[in-house]
Amino acid sequence: MGTTTMGVKLDDATRERIKSAASRIDRTPHWLIKQAIFNYLEKLENDETLPELPALLSGAANESDDASEPTEEPYQPFLEFAEQILPQSVRRAAITAAWRRPETDAVPMLLEQARLPQPLGEQAHKLAYQLAEKLRNQKTASGRAGMVQSLLQEFSLSSQEGVALMCLAEALLRIPDKATRDALIRDKISNGNWQSHIGRSPSLFVNAATWGLLFTGKLVSTHNETSLSRSLNRIIGKSGEPLIRKGVDMAMRLMGEQFVTGETIAEALANARKLEEKGFRYSYDMLGEAALTAADAQAYMVSYQQAIHAIGKASNGRGIYEGPGISIKLSALHPRYSRAQYDRVMEELYPRLKSLTLLARQYDIGINIDAEEADRLEISLDLLEKLCFEPELAGWNGIGFVIQAYQKRCPFVIDYLIDLATRSRRRLMIRLVKGAYWDSEIKRAQMEGLEGYPVYTRKVYTDVSYLACAKKLLAVPNLIYPQFATHNAHTLAAIYQLAGQNYYPGQYEFQCLHGMGEPLYEQVVGKVADGKLNRPCRIYAPVGTHETLLAYLVRRLLENGANTSFVNRIADNTLPLDELVADPVSAVEKLAQQEGQAGLPHPKIPLPRDLYGSGRSNSAGLDLANEHRLASLSSSLLNSALHKWQALPMLEQPVAEGEMQPVVNPAEPKDIVGYVREASDAEVQQALTSAINNAPIWFATPPQERAAILERAAVLMESQMPTLMGILVREAGKTFSNAIAEVREAVDFLHYYAGQVRDDFDNETHRPLGPVVCISPWNFPLAIFTGQIAAALAAGNSVLAKPAEQTPLIAAQGVAILLEAGVPPGVIQLLPGRGETVGAALTSDERVRGVMFTGSTEVATLLQRNIASRLDPQGRPTPLIAETGGMNAMIVDSSALTEQVVIDVLASAFDSAGQRCSALRVLCLQEEVADHTLTMLRGAMSECRMGNPGRLTTDIGPVIDAEAKENIERHIQAMRAKGRTVYQAVRENSEDAREWRHGTFVPPTLIELDSFDELKKEVFGPVLHVVRYNRNELDKLVEQINASGYGLTLGVHTRIDETIAQVTGSAKVGNLYVNRNMVGAVVGVQPFGGEGLSGTGPKAGGPLYLYRLLSSRPQDAVGVTFARQDAERPLDAQLKTLLEKPLQALQQWAAGRPELQALCQQYSEQAQSGTQRLLPGPTGERNTLTLMPRERVLCVADNEQDALIQLAAVLAVGCEVLWPDSALQRDLAKKLPREVSERIRFAKAEQLPVQAFDAVIYHGDSDQLRELCEQVAARDGAIVSVQGFARGETNLLLERLYIERSLSVNTAAAGA
């Protein structure tokens, strides 16, 4: 959509009036001017009388046009963003305002609108009862439809078998290789409890299928327990799997055919004739996912064009009401159909929509714009508005639009559509559906922390909304042709009564889904004389190959198999018909009586804010598709850009300004974001003294008060989100969505650690370390910075914070918020500067009691060596918590859905310009699907926009600075020189290209490697390496990934549970992700941190982190924290029992040593390794935290008592023990029982530097401990932590021996 700038000269007074008026309503002057022009134009175009016009016109003739030519203005941050905000009419603003309104506001209003007058209500109930009774008493539908319906009824989604069938249906037909197909069948069938379904269904087919699945299940089970399976295996032998594959394949195709009208449009038109003869009509839908590439969009365009020609010819002049029509999905016609890409959608998608509509008009067939996700509703209305005013379509009534009753905005959308029909002088076809994206709408709102849901949380509210909306549509027959899509007998009957008895052709129609609604509507379509209702029904008929059926089929199965759906309940003979056809208005009123208020949300679906229960709030997000939120954000951003930000040292006493350095926007060198001054040596010393002096005051503050201060900081930070976003976008090159996520993560850290100290800590028993240095990175300059500080403060430590030198301004704002919340000035201090000066001065000071660092592995190693020789007054080594990088891989097999893989790869590899510790670095594709996946990935990369993140349209911003850009480009060049295939792509845009020359941009890059181990180190930027692997060598691939030494994140995309178990069971990685992206770990949901070269642990935003920041605490402290969590959610401790067998052997052996026996018992009770906990999180996702034992612990003691104390602790956790090869240890080992001695390894003193161990426990003198710490720190490889104790001490910290593994599974993939 072309735009132009029309300059208007204003005097200063008028300009100030506009600015002042705009700020009063939290809008920008640009918005106010645009909105005023829009409103005035609308009035003029609608011929409204404007009293000021006559006077103005008479005096205006002599005035000259003062529109000036646009002039080159200095760079103003966020100006383009302000210009992208759209003006709205009153009706459109009402739609936006209703987006997430509380159900308690929306439902009472709907009840009045949906209520049927007394006689009509009774008639509707009577008719509904008759329809339902006939439907239930009908012989089960014959043939294929009956078989499939019985099968779906028997295997409901609440059963494991139902889910297995759905996973099979979703994936089987698209897998190219037989081996993976067989693995999927084996995986889904061998674990099913098929016996429980035998004989339960009256349908022969279901019983036959169940027997087949039972035999198959036995046949493919990995454990051949029964003689039945052995004999079957003998009979079928090697020919078994192909037979089974054929059988299952046939069953899946059968299900496919049940829901799809034909594989091609010609086949579908032929199949439709039978029901057309009975009076049914059709609307055809070309199946497929949303387009991700230009090629996808073009293919769908051609498919729609061909379909319109075919349908048009078949229609043969029957017209829009009597003849067939087509439904189109706008997301299939453009790869970037979203609010952020508004101009592209209008310039590129709109002409396609217009040409399809003109083609439909040529044949006079109806064309319906399908409804999609809630955030696409308003942009679809803009496209519709434009279409309705096309001169070539004037007077034609075939334009159709779909609206969803489950959306709270639906009634307001109808008001707008009626107005649009009036203004464009046409009758619109409006299909009213209930809505098919409910699960994903709930999940998205929860994940993004939005203020509410766009949809109702109770099915019955949607039913009420549907009736209220139906009434509105029926009230304007001259403007709207209503199309009621429902399978619910009560809804059908109510609409039949509301529409009146004097029906005329073209008044309205019903609609149903192919394969689901025909049995009900066979009672509706046809002559009254034949006992029918004589009302038309149009069948929504999907067309496409079985391979394109997947997403559609799963949506239908979810909808059909959901136990609240009419289709599911009608088949349940135990449910009384009266209940089945109950009036939803009465049902809601009954609920209101029980609950004391109408419209209360579903008790099991908390608002996004309350996702984590009463313990803590979820951080609030910001919806970048909501026009009101965008307008308000734009105003705040322009204000934030006027502020000259500063980062001075923030000490207990104010400091002088001194010589300041500019902080420059990496995307635009002309933009000076603010100024920074490095802390001097004297200021560092002053800060250290203050930290020491203030430490006792802060520690003495009760944990509840410390928690309250952190909670206050969270509230302040959330309220300042737009301002903080402004700094993040300009200083760190963050896109808006990344900036929102960053502020939210910082807020979540404050809530999480505050909650933990409030509930679990006591100053009498939990003692802090003392002054702690926090060194944070530039890639998460607010989130990680705040996370480190919040944890240290929560635990009672004073903090010296050194932000990354590239991002001091956002850090200064973060500290200002903490001070405003009530943290005393000497307790938190900010020391901007370089690592080699300020960082080195802080960490090398003897008075520092702990170091928290996020950054490179090399710097972490230097820090560890720097502090290794320092012990605290109790003789304990100084702790370093380091979170470093990773060579993160994603493994994709041929059962994965390519579209989903590509979306997740784009987010994981290129979001934040690849500058995340967790970002995907190596994509591992199974050979059979590599080419197909890469073709789609390259196409999707070409659709990404790279440029200034201050625009809403930008997907990929700059890398942090020129040095980072140089390093990345050097790597790419080196790979090219080695002959590797390098592909770089980004959307061509002249405006963006100008910025690329000045800013530090690197386009998304794809490099194909021969093998994983070709990559020797992490490349921190938008560079994705690809390797292909053979299905049979998956274990070898995981070994290579482990061999890199890093262990931060790993992704798996597969539909095979066995593969998930195989990878997650053998990968040595801190954060695992299944069938989802692998970035954006959420505090407390996916605790974050790696192992090996990727970090020391414990995980940030996890239950163990705060314990690392204490100098002492009760023995059972960790257990208390876990017990509190376990009271809310289930605990799986199966593995713990297995791990403790050697400890039990030691306990029995220690019969004559009561102290050791008691200690074994104590450690056994305290040990948490081998436990798996379910963590709170959004719907459609399963998050767990598993505690595993470290592999091998070096135990150093000079007497038998201490050696046994160490042995008991290590065995309680389940690790191997590494003993120095000395007489003491050798003699002791001989005495121990076999189960214990098998867990012990020996190493000679000179071999220790090269021996593998990942933790150390020492009892003895402090001088030797210091020496040991230095030796361990001097080793190459991962940082290993050392616990040091005086002789005889038994308070060993078992949590230091755990490895934490976080696993996040997208359970919505394949409807699992």
From Swiss-Prot:
Biological-process GO terms, alphabetical: proline biosynthetic process; proline catabolic process to glutamate
NAD found in the keyword field: yes
GO cellular component terms listed in the entry, alphabetical order: cytoplasmic side of plasma membrane
Pathway: Amino-acid degradation; L-proline degradation into L-glutamate; L-glutamate from L-proline: step 1/2; Amino-acid degradation; L-proline degradation into L-glutamate; L-glutamate from L-proline: step 2/2
SUPFAM superfamilies cross-referenced by the UniProt entry: ALDH-like, FAD-linked oxidoreductase, N-terminal domain of bifunctional PutA protein, Ribbon-helix-helix
Superkingdom in the source lineage: Bacteria
Transmembrane feature ranges: none
Listed CDD domains: ALDH_PutA-P5CDH, RHH_CopAso-like
Region (Proline dehydrogenase): 228-574
Keyword Repressor applies: yes
UniProt-annotated stretches for the region Aldehyde dehydrogenase: 653-1119
Cofactor(s) this protein requires: FAD
Positions annotated as active site in the UniProt record: E883, C917
Entry similarity comment: In the N-terminal section; belongs to the proline dehydrogenase family. In the C-terminal section; belongs to the aldehyde dehydrogenase family.
Record-linked NCBIfam families: D1pyr5carbox3, PRK11809.1, PRK11904.1
PANTHER family tied to this protein: DELTA-1-PYRROLINE-5-CARBOXYLATE DEHYDROGENASE 1, ISOFORM A-RELATED, DELTA-1-PYRROLINE-5-CARBOXYLATE DEHYDROGENASE 2, ISOFORM A-RELATED
Protein name according to UniProt: Bifunctional protein PutA
